[in-house]
Design a protein with these regions (language model features):
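Non-catalytic accessory segments flanking enzymatic or RNA/DNA-binding domains
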Residues: 1-204
Length: 204
């Protein structure tokens, strides 16, 4: 159902370019450090509703031209904050959490390191992450109309063929998460989706 070419959720893993990510949790002084060629996919593996779980106004990316540079920067963070490691939040899947890259009470220092690296080595600092994500989602906004229509059609088929009561299905959660993400990024979804999809979103 969610063909990558049709989905409004961007995928863009590049061969050489990589990103170091620093992701503070919204509700506690805890953050995740790592690197990825596809930061959005990484966000989604950490939490399906990453846009509410992480603080997008304090999160940031460091863009590098090579994976080697990304690994080096990640290693610097790991070594600098070694004495401030913290367990991953329970809501983060074990397979996605990592074992040594969650830290408590280090956001200001992590941001200072990033700004120094950008100034001294020319890396691109994407801060806040919200702006980077908004630009990325706007690039794919034109795909949202057809994708959301397909999703709602499948949801309605499920609804009429599944006994009630029932919990929200995987398809319902996927559609709501996608629309909530656009909304969180201050992208007006009403003109981007069919009227029945917008009505479903507001009523469910």
């Amino acid at each position: 159902m969610e063909d990558e070419g049709d989905s409004p959720i961007p995928r863009f893993a590049s061969r050489g370019r990589a990103f170091v990510y620093v992701l503070p949790c919204r509700d506690e002084d805890l953050l995740k450090v790592g690197f990825s060629r596809d930061p959005l996919q990484r966000l989604q593996t950490l939490h399906a509703r990453f846009f509410r779980f992480f603080d997008l106004d304090r999160a940031f990316l460091i863009g590098t031209d090579t994976v080697r540079d990304a690994r080096r920067i990640e290693r610097r963070y790991i070594e600098t904050f070694a004495d401030r490691r913290s367990p991953a939040p329970l809501v983060v899947p074990d397979a996605a959490a990592g074992y040594t890259e969650w830290y408590r009470g280090v956001h200001a220092e992590a941001e200072a390191i990033a700004r120094t690296l950008a100034a001294e080595e020319g890396f691109t600092l994407h801060a806040p992450l919200r702006d980077w994500l908004r630009a990325l989602f706007r690039e794919r906004a034109a795909l949202l109309f057809a994708w959301s229509a397909k999703m709602l059609e499948a949801i309605e088929y499920e609804r009429f063929n599944t006994p009630l009561p029932r919990a929200p299905s995987t398809l319902e959660r996927a559609l709501r998460d996608a629309l909530d993400c656009f909304d969180e990024l201050a992208i007006d979804i009403e003109p981007l989706v069919p009227e029945p999809v917008f009505r479903w979103y507001r009523e469910n």
